UniProtKB/Swiss-Prot annotation:
Binding-site list for heme: C450
GO cellular component, one term: membrane
Family statement drawn from the similarity comment of this UniProt entry: Belongs to the cytochrome P450 family.
Source organism, top-level taxon: Eukaryota
Named cofactor requirement(s): heme
Name of the protein: Cytochrome P450 monooxygenase FUP2
Keyword set includes Transmembrane: yes
Usage in biotechnology: Fusaproliferin shows cytotoxicity against pancreatic cancer cell lines and provides a new chemical scaffold that can be further developed to obtain more potent synthetic agents against pancreatic cancer. Fusaproliferin and its analogs show also anti-inflammatory activity and can be hit compounds for the treatment of inflammation-associated diseases.
UniProt enzyme class: oxidoreductase
Membrane-topology annotation of the record: Multi-pass membrane protein
Length: 509
């Protein structure tokens, strides 16, 4: 006698009702486990974060990750659970514990959001995402050759060449009294610079619009990647990764990325290298450390370094310009410092700009307010440990929220305001005398700190030095765009504009 399921006698409505009941019971079970039984149940945080990735997905979708995470820390304190298996810290002690000793095996890049995103978009791990500390140390050692003081000195003429070329547009605007989005101008300028520094020739020249379209596409996929990273932590779900890769590969992102620098052109470029210490020749030196990089790893590292370096530096350029234009006293002071130091633009060098106290104070203050390495890029996977007095189970994703730390009244006076004078020598009675400068770590610390930070700061100084020596700028409609209110933040900053009126500086021909 054949077995007949009782469900076969049920109506479609009854079967649907049963499915709803089972789903509801499963959801209640997940909520109960996340809130009352999970190893992280002792850590406070929003209700949704206790059992789902929905809080993070919403913050990424709204493009308000930094400000909303800061609000959580203000509500719950220095330790906040922002996902079922994710904890954010907002203290200097936690930041030091997580990032200072990367090679001891306690904190890994494996399984983090950035590593997953990179794995889905690129075909091989990069210096930025590679989990293995030994391989990372070897790769870091060879790529570091592109960022030594000697290499930076040899790169300066290339930076100056592209700055001079880009200033022709500003020259025409200054003559006609025109207006421009200076953020867009600065980013285009640096795109050409880093493309040349990376590959030994302007291999990406004119392709910034392609990248910008990719950035918008990437912005829309962030919540989906967050959901995927959550599901991959569940038992038996790892096989989904291959399916997810296939689905995301079907999107325009990977194919468009290859259009920025086709692999065939990259190989041609590598064969034409003339000994310049750029990103490409540094990566080619990997064999000196017994590292053999296949074509995918070669391409992924070249593109990963270039795009990461471009986006963080371009944002800092735009944000620094934005801040000094909003504060006339700061703008006038930095212009006076530059114009009184250099008689002609030929005297402007990276070394001399590095000695200008107020210019560098403006850059540092911008990096304090808007650290480029913040958000999901700073995640690590922890072993069983104690961070800032809180027990963290093995496998927990942890990060220190630089945005909140560097805006904390615990470490800085008047923390939300742009006050570059805090970085100058301060008097005993100064309100900034008690600032804890050790809490300023915009490029992170330890072996995973940004490898290109000196190159980035040299480019920023050269661009500002040349532009402010020759031109005056006036921001239009200051209330039309407010960075904290209008710029998007997730993995990167997006959707910012700085509209200015361009004029020749007094006495400049």
């Amino acid at each position: 006698m054949a077995f007949t399921s009782p469900l076969s006698t049920w109506s479609l409505g009854q079967q649907f009702g049963l499915a709803l009941v089972i789903s509801a019971l499963a959801l209640v079970s997940v909520i109960i486990y996340g809130c009352f039984l999970h190893p992280l149940r002792h850590i406070p945080g929003p209700f949704l974060a206790k059992f789902s990735p929905l809080w993070i997905m919403r913050a990424l979708h709204r493009m308000r990750f930094n400000s909303e995470l800061q609000a959580l820390h203000q509500q719950y304190g220095n330790v906040v659970r922002i996902g079922p298996n994710e904890v954010s810290f907002a203290s200097l002690e936690a930041e030091t514990a997580i990032y200072a000793k990367q090679e001891d095996g306690r904190f890994s890049k494996a399984g983090t959001f950035l590593t997953l995103f990179s794995d889905l978009v690129l075909n091989a791990p990069t210096l930025i995402t590679i989990p293995d500390p030994i391989l990372h140390r070897k790769l870091h050692k060879v790529i570091q050759q592109a960022f030594t003081p000697q290499a930076l000195a040899r790169q300066e003429p290339i930076q100056k060449l592209h700055i001079d070329m880009a200033m022709s547009e500003l020259e025409e605007l200054a003559k006609s009294g025109g207006t421009v989005d200076i953020a867009d101008t600065l980013e285009t300028m640096f795109w050409e610079i880093i493309g040349d520094l990376a590959f030994g020739e302007p291999l990406m020249s004119g392709k910034r619009p392609t990248y910008e379209s990719l950035k918008q596409l990437g912005k829309s996929t962030m919540p989906m990647v967050e959901a995927l990273s959550f599901f991959l932590t569940l038992p038996g779900i790892a096989s989904v990764f291959g399916i997810a890769r296939s689905l995301i590969t079907a999107l325009p992102f990977p194919s468009q990325l290859s259009k920025l620098v086709p692999s065939s052109k990259l190989r041609d470029c590598a064969e034409r290298q003339d000994g310049r210490e750029d990103f490409l020749t540094a990566i080619m030196g990997s064999e000196k450390q017994d590292l053999v990089l296949d074509a995918d790893a070669f391409f992924s590292n070249a593109m990963g370094l270039t795009l990461a370096g471009y986006q963080t530096t371009a944002t800092t350029l735009a944000a620094t310009f934005y801040h000094i234009l909003r504060y006339p006293e700061a703008y006038n002071r930095v212009c006076f410092e530059i114009r009184s130091t250099f008689v002609s633009d030929e005297e402007i060098t990276g070394a001399r700009l590095g000695r200008l106290p107020f210019l560098n104070a403006c850059i540092r203050e911008t990096l304090r307010l808007l650290p480029p390495a913040n958000g999901k890029t700073a995640q690590r996977t922890a072993s069983s440990c104690t961070i800032d007095g809180v027990h963290i189970p093995a496998g927990t994703t942890v990060s220190a929220d630089l945005y909140t730390i560097q805006r904390s009244p615990k470490y800085f006076a008047d923390p939300a305001a742009f006050r570059p004078e805090r970085w100058l020598d301060v008097a005993e009675d100064s309100e900034f005398k008690r600032d804890n400068r050790a809490a300023y770590r915009p490029f992170l610390i330890g072996s995973r700190a940004c490898i290109g930070r000196e190159m980035a700061q040299q480019s920023i100084r050269l661009i500002f030095g040349n532009l402010l020596w020759k031109y005056d700028f006036q921001q239009l409609d200051q209330d039309g765009f407010v960075w904290e209110r209008d710029a998007g933040s997730s993995l990167i900053y997006t959707d910012y504009k700085v509209m200015v009126h361009v004029m020749k500086a007094s006495g400049r021909s």
